[in-house]
């Protein structure tokens, strides 16, 4: 079994010096943004608890979020909201969020480890890794940053639209959420391209990622 730093070590051996892991959260929900994160960790970094954010409890993710913020050399976050998702489709929106996350880094990486199958539209050497959040500490760290950042955005949206209980479902298509859509229609952050019946939208206030 390979270690969580295998792909990082491989990149260092190939001569790269600044490696960023990139991952996203929120491709599947019916509402809210897709959020991506890019994380540059120190050379040789490891942490026994850092893994795919989906395998962690909310409390554990929050604790590891603070650990990663403390230990990382640089963190970048990209957010693409639902109107853009509807306009360009979820895959392109995800890749756009990933590119924004890399551009948001305070240090320019020379190599990217990207979760999934698709390369980011940036002129930087990169390797895509299916299930990379379980195989790379850099990608796993990015998955935690992306997930916690998105959850916090959805908590803000919950205060604007409490009838959908975004605090609990984070925009995913739970039974409760679908029933709320049937009862209240769409609000402004719902993804119209995700085939959920639309009624009159409500107003939307802008969410600032740095409000939390």
UniProtKB/Swiss-Prot annotation:
Localisation per UniProt entry: Cytoplasm
Cofactor binding, note field: Manganese or magnesium. Binds 1 divalent metal ion per monomer in the absence of substrate. May bind a second metal ion after substrate binding.
A GO term, aspect molecular function = RNA-DNA hybrid ribonuclease activity
Major location, coarse class?
cytoplasm
Cofactor(s) in the UniProt record: Mn(2+); Mg(2+)
Q: Which UniProt keywords apply?
A: Cytoplasm, Endonuclease, Hydrolase, Manganese, Metal-binding, Nuclease
Q: Is Metal-binding one of the keywords UniProt gives this record?
A: yes
Gene3D superfamilies found in the cross-reference section: Ribonuclease H-like superfamily/Ribonuclease H (3.30.420.10)
Residue stretches making up the RNase H type-2 domain? 17-206
Under catalytic activity, the entry for this protein gives:
Endonucleolytic cleavage to 5'-phosphomonoester
Q: What does this protein do?
A: Endonuclease that specifically degrades the RNA of RNA-DNA hybrids.
What is the protein's name according to its record? Ribonuclease HII
Task: Tell me the name of the encoding gene.
Answer: rnhB
